[in-house]
Amino acid sequence: ACSAG
């Protein structure tokens, strides 16, 4: 999974 924030 990828997350950005």
From Swiss-Prot:
Q: Which organism is the protein's source?
A: Eisenia fetida (Red wiggler worm)
Give the function comment from the record: Displays antimicrobial activity against E.coli, S.aureus and P.aeruginosa.
Q: Which UniProt keywords apply?
A: Antibiotic, Antimicrobial
One BP term from GO: defense response to bacterium
Protein's recorded name: Antimicrobial peptide OEP3121
Source organism phylogeny: Eukaryota, Metazoa, Spiralia, Lophotrochozoa, Annelida
User: Looking at the record's lineage, which domain of life comes first?
Assistant: Eukaryota
